[in-house]
A protein has these predicted regions:
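C-terminal, flexible cofactor-proximal segment of oxidoreductases
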Residues: 4-5, 24, 30, 34, ...
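A conserved FAD-binding loop/helix module that cradles the flavin
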Residues: 345-384, 389
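Beta1-alpha1 glycine-rich phosphate/pyrophosphate-binding loop at the start
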Residues: 2-9, 13-16, 22-117, 201, ...
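Short glycine-rich anion-binding loops that position phosphate/pyrophosphate groups of nucleotides
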Residues: 56, 148-151, 213, 303-305
């Protein structure tokens, strides 16, 4: 029911007829419940636009919402925040995607000065202080870029087309669905034809590659023979390929050696110092010329950043990362800041070539900048590394923490506790703990189901409304 206010006493409906006493009373009550103005209307508060809801963006948002009176707009192409260190568990069916993610709109509903805008950044206009998204334009007083990095295929379009990345929740679900489809299809084939569909090649010897190889090996040992008895004659192999001479290159030598021994114990084939050269969907070719026949290449071999339209080439440093000063603002734009993987800060004496592209760094930078923009600190940003850890398999992991090198059960327990406590909400922590307990005691994964929407479902739904 629409109303037209003609003076302080009389209200008319859309047909210009006076409202009844009941209608007028109801209209007054509804009007009293509405805000005097929309938060998108003119506002004298400083407007901070924050692009990216990853570790850096969320930590920065928490501090800004807590300490500042600024008006904040959070921009992300996805309407959820997720916990990247556990996406490999989603790809293996140990966890549901909802166990490690949380809706952004529900998250920001606790903050009166924060609004969410879904969209992908297309360009920045530093002169006019505006950004262009695929969903429209937004003006800003301060801009924070924390949009993270993308999977790095090192310019190889063939790899980008055929390899399976593991960077996002969508990637993890694609891997899960792909592998289940491969297992099911292989079960219908003669034994001699199954190998390429069951063999898995993982590119990248960092934590993501090692943890994925470990969990896939665990599925082979504890699950596959029960769920796919027809595949007992040939369950395929797992090969981990890395360009480095060791696994977990940033970690201690003792952790590297222990990881290598455990991988070999789990019957994971290891290939060192021989990066992937090409992959056509059927055959992996390494730099040495060695070939591996597989339909399953999972890519965890690094990340890269993209150039942002509107910024100049001198704004970028090595790896297409934005050059920032000691307060994380762009060298040439003091009203634009960068955080996380996309930021390159060279002022820190301990990291003269820039901080590593890690979640720890992103979280630390986000917390710092939120406090800095809220006036809670004026010191320069300095990063203190807390340590590294990696899960290898059931009851075994490695951890380098404050000079101590843990391995085996102790490292595994530390890894489990730290990762559970790092999840966003109590619901995430409880769900993850429960699903891990079920998998641990029963040897079964609850989410080994291939559930995919029809590829044209959204298109058909949209067209039906036209």
């Amino acid at each position: 029911m629409s109303t037209l206010i003609v003076d302080n006493e009389t209200k008319l409906n859309k047909n210009n007829q006076p409202l009844s006493s009941h209608q007028a009373s109801l209209s007054s009550k509804l009007s009293a419940q509405l805000p005097e103005k929309s938060p998108t209307e003119a506002d004298n508060r400083r407007h901070i636009v924050l692009i990216g809801a990853g570790f850096a963006g969320i930590r920065c948002l928490e501090q800004l919402a807590k300490y500042s009176a600024d008006r904040i707009t959070l921009v992300d192409r996805n309407d959820y925040h997720f916990f990247p260190p556990l996406i490999y568990q989603v790809s293996a069916g140990f966890l549901a995607s909802s166990d490690i993610s949380y809706p952004l709109r529900r998250y920001i509903s606790n903050y009166d000065n924060v609004r969410y805008r879904q969209g992908t950044l297309l360009s920045i206009n530093p002169k006019d202080k505006t950004i262009t998204l695929d969903t429209g334009e937004i003006s800003y007083d301060r801009l924070i870029i924390a949009k993270g990095a993308e999977t790095n295929y090192f310019g190889n379009q063939e790899l980008a087309m055929h390899a399976l990345p593991m960077k996002t929740i969508k990637d993890a679900l694609s891997i899960r669905n792909h592998m289940l489809s491969q297992f099911n299809y292989a079960a219908s084939l003669p034994v001699a034809e199954r190998e390429p569909y069951l063999s898995i090649v993982i590119a990248g010897g960092g934590p993501s590659g090692v943890e994925l190889a470990g969990v896939m090996s665990e599925i082979r040992r504890y699950t596959l023979h029960k769920e796919y008895p027809e595949l007992l004659d040939n369950i395929g192999g797992i090969t981990l390929v890395t360009a480095d001479p060791v696994l977990l290159a940033p970690m201690s030598e003792s952790s590297q050696q222990y990881t290598k021994l455990q991988m070999e114990k789990f019957r994971v084939d290891l290939i060192f110092s021989d990066p992937v050269k090409s992959y056509d969907g059927h055959m992996v070719t390494l730099q040495s010329g060695q070939t591996l026949h597989t339909h399953n290449l999972i890519w965890t071999a690094g990340v890269t950043c993209d150039f942002i339209q509107g910024l100049d080439t001198e704004d970028y440093g090595q790896g297409k990362r934005l050059l920032v000063d000691s307060h994380l603002s762009l060298i040439n734009h003091n009203d634009i800041y960068a955080l996380g993987d996309i930021a390159l800060a060279t002022h820190d004496e301990a990291y003269p070539k820039g901080h590593p592209q890690l979640g720890q760094v992103a979280s630390s930078q986000g917390t710092y900048l939120g406090k800095y923009l809220s006036g809670k600190t004026d010191k320069a940003f300095h990063y203190k590394h807390s340590g590294d850890m990696a899960m290898i398999g059931r009851l075994t992991a490695v951890a380098d923490i404050n000079g101590s090198h843990l391995k085996g059960f102790i490292a595994w327990f530390a890894w489990v506790v730290i990762h559970i406590l790092s999840l966003s909400t109590a619901k995430n922590r409880l769900a993850t703990t429960w699903n891990w307990m079920v998998a641990f005691f029963t040897g079964k994964q609850s989410f080994r189901m291939s559930i995919e929407p029809h590829e044209d479902s959204f298109k058909l739904k949209k067209e039906s409304k036209l």
